Amino acid sequence: MYQSNPKTPFVPGFEVAGTVRECSVDSKFAVGDRVVAATTVFRSGRHGSFGEYCVASENLAYKLPEEISYEAGAAILMSYLTSDFALHRRAQLKKDEIVLVNAAAGGVGISAVQLAKIEGAKVIAAVGSNEKKEFIQQFEPDLVINYQMENLKDVVEEKFGKRPVNVFYDQVGGEPYEEGIRLLSSEGRALIVGFASGNIPSQLLSYLLVKNISLMGVFMISFENEDKEYLERRMKTIFDHYLNKTIKPVYETINFDEIIKYLELIGSRKTIGRIVALR
């Protein structure tokens, strides 16, 4: 859930993998190039990746290495680039810091767990079911919690001590956000990635003040106008991680005519990983 929802009618979708069919004469791309791209432009209201053809800004389009399938590229783009931007650029995560990831079995959460582990951090993965708890174990987080069945604060503090979290990666909002904030250490950093619960929380400003906590917004798409070269470098690093098998995107491929059913599943937060629709 974001603040910049387009007006109807519109073609949904804002990430795609495919082949360049048209580009400007001074483009860094050529017709026939394999690419992944975000088809939204900040504040433009433009989306469109569910269409057979769509338009994308060069600032958020990247050449896809031949060794990476379109399906994997589509699953990687926004999840991993968002998490990399959050952890590397915004939080400046350091080795041995403790990271709490909410919704850790979703596409973005999985990427955050993997990238934090690459940086040498200790990772707490919070999920909403025992199925997801079992699933996320393959990525070797240091602690996994089903917050529907266990008390997040009690379990975390039993293992790591009082208020041990250095970086809190939140894409849920609501009550899980407030619980995570209260686990942050002095000078901790809270990364606000989204509001999957639909509940935009109050900021607990008095708590942020007395604990010297930094609240950081994460909206990678708007950063294209600030430093597109940085995003391009980080995208290359992510592709290298994939080719070196240090990250493993989790996704299910579906036929495009199944997309309504899967959008409903995503909305009910019953999916694991990402859904890639094929045309």
Which residues are covered by each model-predicted region?
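Short, well-ordered loop/turn sites that connect or cap secondary structure elements
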Residues: 29-30, 93, 184
